[in-house]
Amino acid sequence: MKRTFQPSNLVRKRRHGFRARMATASGRAILRNRRAKGRKKLSA
């Protein structure tokens, strides 16, 4: 059976990267919440 997680750094960056987050209003909200919480890493 094929596993669900097939790692790819390119897909990871495109889907969860900083620029992907900044591209949408909801993504910017995620970054805002993570900054408020004091996360060391904001995105992938």
Curated annotation (Swiss-Prot):
InterPro entries: Ribosomal_bL34, Ribosomal_bL34_CS. The keyword Ribonucleoprotein applies. One of its GO terms (molecular function) is structural constituent of ribosome. GO terms for biological process: translation. It comes from the Bacteria. Keywords: Ribonucleoprotein, Ribosomal protein. Belongs to the bacterial ribosomal protein bL34 family. This is Large ribosomal subunit protein bL34.
